[in-house]
Amino acid sequence: MTPSLANFLWSLVLGAAIVLIPATVGLIFISQKDKITRS
């Protein structure tokens, strides 16, 4: 694997992590709050 290809793959992985992790945490947080307000 060339260094530039490795850097490209790492940027994809980091980009996905930066987007997906806060989105997942946010969804879990909202669903937890939603459950509390309903019951």
From Swiss-Prot:
UniProt-listed GO biological process terms: photosynthesis
Keyword Membrane attached: yes
Induction: By high-light stress.
Keyword Transmembrane: yes
Disruption phenotype: Cells have about 30% less PSII and a minor uncoupling of the antenna. Modifies the quinone Q(B) binding site, increased sensitivity to high light (2000 umol photons/m(2)/s); the PSII dimer is less stable under high light.
Main location: membrane
Membrane-crossing segments per the record: 5-28
Keywords: Membrane, Photosynthesis, Photosystem II, Thylakoid, Transmembrane, Transmembrane helix
Membrane topology reported for the UniProt record: Single-pass membrane protein
Cellular location(s): Cellular thylakoid membrane
One annotated Gene Ontology cellular component of this protein: plasma membrane-derived thylakoid photosystem II
Gene3D superfamilies registered for this protein in UniProt: Single helix bin (1.20.5.510)
Summary of the function given for this chain in its UniProt record: Involved in the binding and/or turnover of quinones at the Q(B) site of photosystem II (PSII). PSII is a light-driven water plastoquinone oxidoreductase, using light energy to abstract electrons from H(2)O, generating a proton gradient subsequently used for ATP formation.
UniProt subunit comment: PSII is composed of 1 copy each of membrane proteins PsbA, PsbB, PsbC, PsbD, PsbE, PsbF, PsbH, PsbI, PsbJ, PsbK, PsbL, PsbM, PsbT, PsbX, PsbY, PsbZ, Psb30/Ycf12, peripheral proteins PsbO, CyanoQ (PsbQ), PsbU, PsbV and a large number of cofactors. It forms dimeric complexes.
Family: Belongs to the PsbX family. Type 1 subfamily.
Protein name listed in UniProt: Photosystem II reaction center protein X
Species: Synechocystis sp. (strain ATCC 27184 / PCC 6803 / Kazusa)
